[in-house]
Amino acid sequence: MKMTLFRRIGRRLGARRQRVGPVEGYDRWAATYDAQPNNVVLALESPLFSELLARVVIEGNIVVDIGCGTGRHWPEILSRTPAGLIGVDPSPRMLERLKAHYPDARTACAEGDHLPEIADASSDLIISTLALAHIPGAASAISEWCRILRRGGAILITDFHPGAIRAGMKRTFFSGGETIEIEHYATDLDRLRHIATECGLTAVFAAERAIDESVRPLFERAQYLKAYEKHKGQPLVFGMHFIKP
């Protein structure tokens, strides 16, 4: 999920601003979602996701990708030969784009934090990348994920860092001359660990990735080095690995 980083950028480009819910936002974004060559968040999140994925067994297992979007991580997942891969997203247009890339993909349209099309204890691995903060209730979402996860299974989460939200960063994209801001809900990392523990999960790994020299060229291309200097060192994304004993 692309996030332009700073509130002022829309004003600088003369764009109006509109705040929308996740379904409307990603439906509107779907047609251009895959064209994000200079996205700072994705530049930091993608290698972190690969690090998380290397910690779990994919081959022969059932994987559920919650907030799958257009299937950004699917080439990496499918290269490790899962027994099945299910894409879940609340946006019908995003799922249409996923189907365009993977015509045989099994998909399910999420209903808020509910996954009615997925049976109890039917998955070995749940992946959620840059999606959880779009759900108003993290506790109910993680509880539902635990419902569909088998014992011995794992959950991998990446998301926009709550500290970045507190620093004024937003999840936005540009469409029709407007800056579209997609609603999101920050959950502190300690609170997220507590929720997971209450749901019967065990945290085994966590990491953060901050704005650093590796993404400086992206700020340079956007002619936004002042923002880079201001926010250098700010954690922008985090990743967590939980297991269900």
Please describe what each predicted stretch is:
Residues H184-A206:
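Short alpha-helix
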Residues P116-I126:
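A short acidic, Gly/Pro-enriched loop at the edge of an enzyme's catalytic core
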Residues L125-A138:
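A short SAM/SAH-binding and catalytic strip from SAM-dependent methyltransferases
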Residues A139-R151:
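A short glycine-rich, Lys/Arg-flanked "PGG" loop and its adjoining helix->strand segment in the class I
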Residues V64-I66, T70-H114:
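Class I SAM-dependent methyltransferase SAM/SAH-binding core
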Residues A203-P245:
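A C-terminal cap/extension of S-adenosyl-L-methionine-dependent methyltransferases
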Residues K2-V57, R72-E76, M94-R97, L156-T179, E183, A210, ...:
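Conserved class I S-adenosyl-L-methionine
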